[in-house]
């Protein structure tokens, strides 16, 4: 009987996490890395997503100083390995991140960043320097019936929409998309859960805007951040607002205030 109960609980545990499985880049649907199917495929698959181990999070011991926070925990003990593939998308396009069935109770923000590869993304790490510029975020919005962004994801067919800046210069970029789960965090600085993924894209168009200096990952997410990471999420409200980590959002009109 105990064994049966244990097996019945397995799907619940597995479904408690997730990852981006497909991405609409404008009108182009692109398959992302599947950590459960792609490693065994022959010949090896070459996708735009930097490979990660599984559907679990980057947690306390890794996100502050390890390059696991850059693009997730890698396969075979190596994090943030560039891939050779990219996918083209026009500046200003709508991007739709299609997550696996995100039904878990992980209240927190959803954030999206860009990093300019300064050439080929296959030759760019992103683990050092202030290269990550946030282009979109949603945290806690008390005007919505479901205030936390990540808890709205299941109500949107596990799909999250972000529009690329329309004035950005063409070139190769890393598009980094992330959920932060605050369900187990506390003011002592324990148990934050990050779910990042990195996708190599080639932005096309005639824009001239260059990304400004942004944040470093690792580096910007800190153990002493009691406003964004280590807090009691139940205390957040209309009168006690929440600010996601990673700084302000940048777009066609510069930095948002």
Model-flagged regions — what are they?
Residues 2-110, 117-159, 182-257:
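Peripheral, solvent-exposed domain-edge segments
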Residues 93, 171-172:
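Surface-exposed loop/turn positions
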Residues 114-116, 166, 179:
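Short, structured patches in soluble enzyme cores that scaffold and shape functional sites
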Residues 164, 169-171:
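A glycine-anchored, Pro-Gly-centered beta-turn/N-cap motif
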Residues 173-177:
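A short tyrosine-centered beta-strand micro-motif
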């Amino acid at each position: 009987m105990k064994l049966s109960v244990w097996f019945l609980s397995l799907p619940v545990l597995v479904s408690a996490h997730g990852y981006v499985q497909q991405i609409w880049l404008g009108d182009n649907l692109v398959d992302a890395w599947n950590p459960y199917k792609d490693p065994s495929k022959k010949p090896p698959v070459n996708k735009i997503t930097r490979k990660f181990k599984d559907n679990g999070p980057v947690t306390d011991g890794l996100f502050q100083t390890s390059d696991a926070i850059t693009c997730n925990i890698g396969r075979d003990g190596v994090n943030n390995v560039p891939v050779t593939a990219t996918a083209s998308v026009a500046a200003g396009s709508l991007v739709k991140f299609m997550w696996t069935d995100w039904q878990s109770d992980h209240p927190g923000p959803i954030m999206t960043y860009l990093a300019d590869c300064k050439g080929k993304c296959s030759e760019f790490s992103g683990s050092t320097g202030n290269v990550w510029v946030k282009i979109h975020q949603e945290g806690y919005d008390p005007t919505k019936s479901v205030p936390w962004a990540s808890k709205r994801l299941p109500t949107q067919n596990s799909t999250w929409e972000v529009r690329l800046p329309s004035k950005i210069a063409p070139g190769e970029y890393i598009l980094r998309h992330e959920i932060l789960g605050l369900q187990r965090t506390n003011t002592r600085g324990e148990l934050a859960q990050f779910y990042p993924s990195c996708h190599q894209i080639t932005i096309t168009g005639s824009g001239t805007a260059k990304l400004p200096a942004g944040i470093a990952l690792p580096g910007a997410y800190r153990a002493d951040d009691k406003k964004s990471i280590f807090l009691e999420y139940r205390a957040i409200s209309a009168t006690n607002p929440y600010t996601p980590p990673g700084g302000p959002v940048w777009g066609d009109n510069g930095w948002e205030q």
